[in-house]
Amino acid sequence: MFFKGGSWLWLYIRTSIILGSELNSPAPHGQNNCYQLNRFQCSFEEAQHYCHVQRGFLAHIWNKEVQDLIRDYLEEGKKWWIGQNVMPLKKHQDNKYPADVAANGPPKPLSCTYLSRNFIRISSKGDKCLLKYYFICQTGDFLDGDAHYERNGNNSHLYQRHKKTKRGVAIARDKMPPGPGHLPTTCHYPLPAHLSKTLCHPISQFPSVLSSITSQVTSAASEPSSQPLPVITQLTMPVSVTHAGQSLAETTSSPKEEGHPNTFTSYLQVSLQKASGQVIDEIAGNFSRAVHGLQALNKLQEACEFLQKLTALTPRFSKPAQVNLINSLIYLSEELLRIPFQNNNSLGFKVPPTVCPFHSLNNVTKAGEGSWLESKRHTEPVEDILEMSLVEFGNIGEAFLEQNQSPESSVTLTSANATLLLSRQNISTLPLSSYTLGHPAPVRLGFPSALALKELLNKHPGVNVQITGLAFNPFKDLDNRNIVGSIGSVLLSANRKLLQVHDLMEDIEIMLWRNVSLETHPTSLNMSTHQLTITVNVTSLEKSLIVSIDPDSPLLMTLYLGFQYQPNCTHFHLNITLPKDKVWQKDEEYTWVLNPEHLQHGIGTYYITAVLSERQEGAQQTPSLVSVITAVTQCYYWEIHNQTWSSAGCQVGPQSTILRTQCLCNHLTFFASDFFVVPRTVNVEDTIKLFLRVTNNPVGVSLLASLLGFYVITVVWARKKDQADMQKVKVTVLADNDPSAQFHYLIQVYTGYRRSAATTAKVVITLYGSEGRSEPHHLCDPQKTVFERGGLDVFLLTTWTSLGNLHSLRLWHDNSGVSPSWYVSQVIVCDMAVKRKWHFLCNCWLAVDLGDCELDRVFIPVSKRELFSFRHLFSSMIVEKFTQDYLWLSIATRHPWNQFTRVQRLSCCMTLLLCNMVINVMFWKINSTTAKRDEQMRPFAVAWSELLVSIHTAVILFPINLVIGRLFPLIEPQETLPLFPPIQASCLSDASVEPLSATMVVEELKETVRFLLRRNTYLLSKCEQPPWSSWDITKLVKLLSSLVSSHLEGQGCHQQGERHWARVVPENHHHFCCYLHRVLQRLKSHLGTLGLTQGHQSCDFLDAASQLQKLQELLETHILPTEQEPSREVTSFAILSSEEGKKPISNGLSKWLTSVCWLLLGFTSLASAFFTALYSLELSKDQATSWMISIILSVLQNIFISQPVKVVFFTFLYSLMMSRMPRLNKENEQQTKRILALLAKCSSSVPGSRDKNNPVYVAPAINSPTKHPERTLKKKKLFKLTGDILVQILFLTLLMTAIYSAKNSNRFYLHQAIWKTFSHQFSEIKLLQDFYPWANHILLPSLYGDYRGKNAVLEPSHCKCGVQLIFQIPRTKTYEKVDEGQLAFCDNGHTCGRPKSLFPGLHLRRFSYICSPRPMVLIPTDELHERLTSKNENGFSYIMRGAFFTSLRLESFTSLQMSKKGCVWSIISQVIYYLLVCYYAFIQGCQLKQQKWRFFTGKRNILDTSIILISFILLGLDMKSISLHKKNMARYRDDQDRFISFYEAVKVNSAATHLVGFPVLLATVQLWNLLRHSPRLRVISRTLSRAWDEVVGFLLIILILLTGYAIAFNLLFGCSISDYRTFFSSAVTVVGLLMGISHQEEVFALDPVLGTFLILTSVILMVLVVINLFVSAILMAFGKERKSLKKEAALIDTLLQKLSNLLGISWPQKTSSEQAATTAVGSDTEVLDELP
């Protein structure tokens, strides 16, 4: 509950500064505070008068250091008078001073403050002012006395004693201190030395509390300052001061430039921003107590500057702090008013240059808004201070205006949040006068006639007018009324007394403007029927209704008003004809203001009918579009007694519009208004008529019509695809099933999404369980195509007996058809008898040229832990989600088993597209003022506004996307689980099994061996010969025994090696052992029977049977009973999870919900299309084009960004949740229910036919493991090579695009033009006197054009500045940076030769100027570095022995706005480029992790790492450059008169420019990686590798010889020839000499003998000998390598051949001999080599 009191504070300061500015003296201030302890008793008033006589005041003991200073000199128990603060008036006192009080000051205080010491504690209390105590005076420096320093603690204090005293003190009239009169001098008698003691204390630049938190500030300000208050650099808000009869341009004053370092402000800012509220309050309190001791008027300017910078750097002020600050300035104003003005003629209307910056108002306002909440105890002091500041504000304004000789005068002050006008009027000029205040708070005031002001002007012929316009609400916390627009305050005063103006005969006009950006929500209606009706619901009788009609063309119409009925030409309550005549502003022509007296029917619904005139109807051929706005407004004034806004005595005038409110009031105070747009009822019929204007802008309607046609065509296609998918949703009963078999197995086969994953081969499956195995079954369906890419095929397989718990599954195919390769994802087998299922994760190829090149594979089931692991869930679900939940993509990739149809998906996409369009067009409607495309832009260029609108649309559309995308899947009907009849197990006994023949037993043995070899592929490599092709039973049994033993041993070792796997695999291992046990038992029985019946082989059969018996006993040891097994995780799962009692959605309810979803989609689509068409009709052609581009961008973002992000996020979330809660997988449960429902409908007793002789049932033969086919390896290498080439080309292209997109072809010409402009005659500068003419005739005109300023001639005598210094560079050259700074010349802080706005100050970063009023020390930049001293105070004299070395360097950088036209594509290329860099960084990091230190020995690794590091450095420099640019431009916008240094930005840009060439060079060198695949070009790398040792040796010899000759030339000729003056220049010259480009004439002329010898020997040794040997060694290595080069079949040739075939270019075929040679050699060739 605190208003912005700080705003009043600064309004108050500004006028005070204007008044006191003429007396502001630049005299230096003292730097010591002295305290005089007077040990004679006086009353408070006498003590105060005595201190004033001594040029001081009663001391303010507020600093702990001061207390420590005087503590030892205070007698215990004695009382000392000290100074006190001026407290604000209370509410019970009169808030307006009488005339005598206004002149003489506030009333005298009744209680005064004294100081006393109790032990070591010093305390202050109040007592009657008439009592007589000791007192303490304080001043800067006393008039006379000796001074010496004495150490007291950590501070140095100054003692001062009077040498002699007088009985009386004579005070001159002009030195008399302010006061009501002379006080008795009873206290002024001769004072002994012991009765008066003076203590002096050095003044710090900050109060003690501040210094504790800003220790760095004190150290930063190294220059001595004579000001007692801290000086901080300027702020950045301009202040404008305008007088009557003077233009604003002539009177605008810039903030005063300060020469202090910028670090001073930055340290203080950091300290105050980090300071707590208590510290800030204490600082404000200390300042308030310090200000009360000021007497001179120049102190006011100093206090204002300190407060200005304190408030600018303080983030917030509390209420007590603002009370103290306002109280201090009230005191200063009273002191100002007590002193009569001097030099009246000098004041005039000229604003002094030292005026305090008025932009502090904005800082205090922000601080007030950010202040924290406090208790209500501060409210009353703040309210009183507001009243007092307003009164003193008027008094100061009146005092200022009285100094002007003209009878009428005015001055205007403007800040960021307030505008103030002070004017003096008389009896003849005040009536009917008007005043207008401009930005930021526009207010217009008009006074009534002389008759209404007669009584006032008779009493006061001269009146001072004070008008204030505020852009904020100062009473926001006192009254929560919604005030909109400017707030005006009008005060009249005369003779320093406020005049009460109320109950006038005529109203005073106050016009209050509102912000033009205020949203008014206009409604566009059509006048096609020459009539429209507006319905408004009035809810308040105090407000006035404003009806604004804005036609697109001039119309003559009549408005009729009716209450609760629609008026017409004959039946109405009120009417008005528009446009109006004789209006003040044009927007009043079509505005109707209805006051409360016009709305006499009270609250209710009013109808306004607009009817075109008859002549207008005849002339109106096409329907006209009008924009209608209805709003209510009311005028208020601030009732100061009740602290609230009131409307009594004020009414809304007829000149009110949507942008302003005219208030007519009969009194003067604060005025404000509110504004509210009234909701209005829109007639839909009138809105639909807008479509008659579709010919003006058919973009939106045409786009909607095109989308509708496209939707209809696509829906027809989607409907046909959905019907075709219905045929694929079925359970196929295998044709080779036995009709009498009773055990059913449901097999779900998932084909992967890999490229060419579908197969045309015949697939066979075999199931293996603990109780046996099934027959091989051919998986086929004559009615549909099976095993399509990403498809699901469901088969029903039947067996005679139960297979028990499944442990293996075998798949193979015959490799037939056009595309036999098959990628199988997973297989799920369900046992319908026991309601269990097993998951077999395959994820492999069954092909002869892909994967492991196998056609026959055996898979084992996975456990629960592996099935629900996060890795498996995410990898499997990500593909499913992208193909099924990716809304746009799933229209084409929708799974037939998914119930979310293509038609539904397409409808959802169309709804999202229409929502996208309406959101886009709403943005363009809101931003219609800024949504114009640049005419110079290319037709397909993308603007920033279009990109931002598309991003905003995508963000808003994201939740809508989530809802619409899940609308139909959430209401899918759940299938009911069918009831299957129980199956009677009919297991055949062993006795009933028919005996097998020997051939069948051998086949059984072979099948078992093949199964074991396929199940454990690592056993296949151990078999040296294929014994499974033999018919010898002994060998087969031996092989079977070894395979089983190996399996058991391998399983045991695996369990010991990986203990965590023991809980998963042994359960499957148990079932596998049971299966082997049954197989061995059956084979042993058959072999035993054959041994008894077959006489010629009985021994073999019996031996085999006994061997199988031993193997069976071995298996029994691995098979534990069920009750003895440890608890292990099983690999079988229930077909369906246990139901939780949740009732499924019935079909009827599901159909109803589906209808509701369709209605919702239809309504959303129609509404979006309707409003899109309406909004698009109001867009211009340029806006429609931008809107179309935004729609395209939004759709692309939705397709390529929003949908993928949604899919990845939800896949990650579901995978994470399902890995912990597997029951959440409801989609698979629903699909399983649907499969079971289909299974219940199909008959499994279909007569089947099985041809046992069909070769498809024979598994492919097992061959020894061989290497992958060469064709497969070559394809892989070719694919990798193609990817490397494309990525490398893309990388280089993006790098070139990102670099050259920011370049401008005209930059060279601009650079040359600037260089020629500034370099003219610059080389002729040899002495300091030459510099000033060049700066005057070339530098300044080039910088500022033709403006020459008041002082057109620039000479050394005009400026008191030192010579330029370069402290960073020890060289003696001076550098002039044209783009980086501006030259400034100063004389005691004032500019010369240029206006101050063009010469902001000393800001050159590389130059230092010594500017001082004192005798200066000059350090000229000559080679001797002499130090010269000038003692001349008024002139400039120096001695210069050396001369300048002139050097000019020009640096420039491109602004961000210059490349904004095509910046979108540049940004896209940069983003993709840095993504590739991140990818390369990841690859290099992986290689570094693998290779460790060997990574740095690879040349390609170093090259790639260098590119990555330089790219990231460039990214950092770009970010730094953008940050600096935005920072500099923000500073420029804040204060355009302030100097902005671009030095740092230029340096960063220069570093980036020099560095950007290296990645281009390295990326070009990296193209060698592409050339090395050609055998002809690879010979170069091999040559360098072979000759590397010799090359290094020769390079070392050349370097040694070059160093020796460079040193010799430098020592012999360095003093005489400039080319050899340093070692490096000598080395460069020697290299040029060897290349033949150096001039040796100077060497021959200086020393013919020695010079000739050195040059001749260097040429012979280095050129003719060493370099020739170096080249010869390389040529020899090249010859050897060329002879050993063989013709190789490189991949690059294959790639070129494929590319030629793709483009239709004939490729020459090789002969048979060349092909044979190539094939013979190609197998031993390594294609991938390291880059040399």
From Swiss-Prot:
Glycans are attached at N286, N363, N515, N537, N575. One of its GO terms (biological process) is detection of mechanical stimulus. Autoproteolytically processed at the GPS region of the GAIN-B domain; this cleavage modulates receptor activity. It is found in: Cell membrane. SUPFAM superfamilies: C-type lectin-like (SSF56436), Lipase/lipooxygenase domain (PLAT/LH2 domain) (SSF49723). Highly expressed in placenta, weakly in heart and lung. Residues 1613-1651 are annotated as: Channel pore-region. Pore-forming subunit of a heterotetrameric, non-selective cation channel that is permeable to Ca(2+). Also shows permeability towards NA(1+), K(+) and Mg(2+). Heterotetrameric complex channel is activated by external low pH and Ca(2+), but opens only when the extracellular pH rises again and after the removal of acid stimulus. May act as a sour taste receptor in gustatory cells; however, its contribution to sour taste perception is unclear in vivo and may be indirect. This is Polycystin-1-like protein 3. The gene is PKD1L3.
